[in-house]
Each structure stands twice: as C-alpha cells, then as structure tokens.
Regions:
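Short beta-strand and adjoining strand-loop segment in the mid-core
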Residues: 88-92, 119, 130-138
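Mobile beta-alpha loop/short-helix "lid" or hinge segments that flank ligand
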Residues: 24-36, 116-125, 156-168
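Acidic/polar active-site rim loop that often engages polyanionic ligands
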Residues: 36-41, 86, 124-131
Length: 196
C-alpha cells in the first residue's frame, strides 16, 4: 500500500483518518482563485450517487492539475467527497444557521444515507470507490437542534452534523462504515492505495 499521498481536502477528519492508516500526506489545497463551490453544485435531478462520484472526480482532476502547475514531485493524489441523502434529496453543507436547523429537522427521527466517494490518481490511473452507510437519528426536540446548531459543529459538514462529535448523542444506529460517515472510508481507501 502506498504510504504517501497529496491530500486534496481541508477536512481535519480526513487528515486524522489518513494518520490512523499510517499514510503520510502533504496538503494540496485549492487557491482562492479556484471556484471550488462550483464543483459542488448539484445538477437538476441528479441522484446522490451520481453527484458524489461526479464531484469527487472533478475535485481529483483539479488537484492533479494543481500538482502539475506547482511542479511538485510525483506522488498519488487523494480526494474525497461526502454527501448526505434522504431519499433523492441531497443535504450538502449548511450555508447558515437556518440551513442547519432545516437539515437537522429533516433528519430528526429518520434514517438517511451517507455516501462518501474517495478517489486516487497516480500517473494516468484514476481509481474511485464509494462507501454507502445508513445513519438513524432519534427524534430530536427543536430545543436540542437549536442547542446543537449553537455549538457551531454543523458548519462545514454535509448534512449539518459530525458523527464523531456532539451529534453522536442523537444517533440511534448506523449501518456501514463509521469512517465513511466521518468522511474517509478507511477500508475502501486502503484498497485503492494497494492498487496503485
């Protein structure tokens, strides 16, 4: 398995999970002139699985170009994207407090899917894998949702929650990959790195 990658992600959770795997990394982040929000725009009628694969592939190609432009030594590039889906509805990262409240009200008492796509590039090779997990939220009172949103934890996270944080108090069950729900499925990532 490759033990060094360029990580094209700002997520501290992805860094933590790579460290857990024993994979060294160097961050390969977008510059302010790159329109990363454009990459994450949902197309009309786009299914969650199609969306997460498309966004991850676009992020990967942008990161490979970034590596080339910066003339960095060649090494595998890794990126990932996580989306939360309730039915065909995609819940991205909340833009504000109202978004976070709406997302969490929607998820309260429901079981939803968390899809995390991870992709790697090495030379001309491109590999992608998707982890799909189910997360069940217990019914939450509005006061509990507001208190959680007030912590600031929902921001920057798909679906407005982080399973590894305070939201865990409201999650009654998960089925699938805990690390996939966090943002980088370790098993799938290791399998991809073995193939390079």
């Amino acid at each position: 398995m490759k033990d060094f990658v360029y990580l094209a992600s700002q997520s501290p959770r992805r860094r933590q999970l790579l460290e857990q795997m024993g994979v060294r990394y160097e961050l390969l982040l977008a510059t302010p002139d790159e329109d990363t929000e454009l990459l994450e725009r949902v197309m009309p009628g786009e299914a969650p699985l199609t969306y997460v694969k498309r966004v991850t592939q676009l992020k990967l190609e942008a990161a490979v170009l970034r590596m080339q432009k910066r003339q960095l030594p060649l090494a595998p590039v890794l990126c990932a994207d996580t989306t939360v889906a309730l039915g065909r509805n995609i819940l991205g990262k909340p833009e504000n407090e109202q978004d976070a409240l709406r997302f969490l009200k929607t998820l309260s008492g429901q079981t939803h899917r968390v899809l995390t796509a991870v992709a790697v590039a090495s030379g001309r090779r491109r590999l992608l894998s998707v982890s799909v997990s189910k997360v069940s939220f217990a019914p939450m009172k509005l006061s509990e949702i507001k208190a959680y949103v007030a912590t600031g934890e929902p921001f920057g996270k798909a679906g407005a929650y982080g399973i590894q944080g305070l939201a865990a108090c409201h999650i009654s069950a998960i089925q699938g990959s805990y690390t996939g729900i966090m943002g980088l499925p370790i098993f799938e990532t290791a399998e991809l790195l073995k193939q390079l």
